[in-house]
């Protein structure tokens, strides 16, 4: 394997794939970048491999596990920080296995490294189970409940900013495969984000029950209040807090006391960044 393969893949991952295909924020990309700075420094200091000599064959499951232990034992990082670094590595090696099939076997081994469980205490982040519990709260026998499920599930699915959700129109949704949504972000920049089949089911149900698949529906926002006006940031926050409180009553250990719309976005960036193709 040529030495250039690793640096080129890392550069493509950080400068093209994450901002382009995944639409990751600059803060998230910066966090990933720091992960690789730490990894490269570790490989030089503890393995004697100069950065310019580092190749994929040096990055084995064993070396990654040693790096994670180094973060905790030497740098005194928390389990949470360790998991953030591992999530970044998972995202990279998931990307690599499609770009460099020759590395598929070792990539799979690295991807098998599990996130570490922290000691039990007050939860301050959302988990898979927490998200599932939250999304099970809306009453689907009511129009408002159907709307709220579609709203929360969409925020979870695509990791959109609150303002991007507020500005959505029915035409923003591509309801035929491949399912996508067009988000208008800061600076009026548009990005196309794929949607999971499960989310499209919720959206289609909501849109059909509210006439949002009809031509005239473009007069209205996708998510609106009783006056057919756009939901506000405060309104969406109220919806999230309402169902978080309900979910917390079901299981206090799964829903953090402090939860925000940004929490859902962070969840998507943290856990979903690894899905590549």
Which ranges hold each PLM region?
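Conserved catalytic core of the tyrosine transesterase superfamily
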Residues: 1-277
């Amino acid at each position: 394997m040529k030495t250039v393969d690793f640096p080129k893949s890392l550069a493509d991952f950080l400068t093209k794939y994450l901002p382009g295909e995944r639409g990751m924020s600059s803060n998230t990309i910066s966090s990933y970048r720091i992960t690789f700075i730490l990894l490269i420094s570790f490989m030089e200091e503890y393995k004697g491999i100069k950065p310019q000599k580092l190749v994929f064959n040096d990055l084995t499951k064993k070396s990654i596990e040693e790096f994670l232990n180094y973060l905790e034992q030497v740098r005194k990082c928390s389990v949470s920080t360790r998991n953030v670094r591992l999530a970044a590595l998972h995202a990279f090696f998931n990307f690599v296995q499609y770009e460099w099939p020759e590395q598929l076997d070792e990539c799979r081994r690295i991807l098998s490294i599990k996130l570490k469980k922290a000691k039990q205490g007050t939860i301050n982040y959302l988990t898979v189970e927490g998200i599932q519990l939250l999304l099970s709260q809306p009453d689907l026998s009511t129009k408002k409940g159907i709307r709220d499920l579609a709203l929360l599930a969409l925020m979870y699915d695509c990791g959109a900013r609150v303002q991007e959700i507020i500005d959505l129109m029915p035409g923003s949704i591509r309801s035929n495969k491949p399912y996508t949504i067009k988000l208008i972000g800061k600076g009026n920049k548009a990005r196309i984000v794929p949607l999971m089949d499960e989310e499209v089911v919720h959206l289609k149900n909501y849109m059909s029950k509210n006439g949002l698949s009809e031509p005239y529906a473009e007069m209205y926002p996708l998510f609106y209040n009783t006056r057919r006006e756009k939901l506000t940031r405060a309104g969406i926050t109220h919806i999230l807090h309402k169902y978080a409180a309900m979910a917390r009553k079901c299981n206090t250990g799964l829903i953090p006391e402090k939860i925000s719309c940004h929490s859902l976005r962070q969840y998507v960036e943290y856990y979903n960044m690894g899905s590549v193709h």
